[in-house]
Amino acid sequence: MKKVLVVICAILLFTGCSCSLNDTKPEEAVETFFEKYRAKDDDIITQLKDTIENEDLTDDAKEKYQELMEKQYDQFAYVIKDVKEENDEATATVELTVLNYKSAILKTEEELKANPEKFNDEEGNFSEEKYMDYKIEKMQEVTDTTTHTIELSLNKENGMWKVNQLSSDDISKLHGLY
């Protein structure tokens, strides 16, 4: 599931980097970048749905994944701590506070190790569906948060600042999976 969410998040982040007409400062581009997620921009949600639809999950699991991601978008917070600008390049240090989905994933993995039979089907075989349902259930219960610091790189193109592609670690941090 972590891989699924990272892929979903990566696609959304790559397309969420577009700038607005007002991004004449790096700070404004960073705000635009994060606010697209908080506002659940139509493009972001459409791409989220398209990405989830292509995953090998039950319809119920797909719906719950989308809800988890939207919950993260609703609840994450960010603070721009510092911006260093040099010519047409900038680096923004941002502190993110996100729902700690990683804690639920770790608990699910521990449960699998301790009680593997819990995830067996009627024939005694491991059921990926049961495991994923349990993992999603645990992620839905998450209320604790975690804080990470990420470094965003930006480039100035035609007078407008644009956030560059995030690293996979930063993508995981943004989505509470790190």
Stretches with model-predicted labels:
Residues D43, L99-Y101, M160-K162:
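Primarily extracytoplasmic ectodomains and periplasmic/lumenal surface modules that are beta-strand-rich
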Residues S20-I80:
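Core segments of small alpha/beta cavity-forming domains
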Residues A114-F126, Q140-Y178:
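Short beta-strand edge/turn micro-motifs at domain boundaries
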Residues M1-L21:
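Sec-dependent N-terminal signal peptides of Gram-positive bacterial secreted proteins and lipoproteins
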Residues Q47-I52, E128-M132, T147-L152:
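Short glycine-rich, low-complexity/disordered patches
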Residues E63-E137, K173-Y178:
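Surface-exposed, charged secondary-structure patches
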Residues V30, Y78-I80, V94, L152-L154, ...:
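Hydrophobic beta-strand residues in large extracellular and virion-surface proteins
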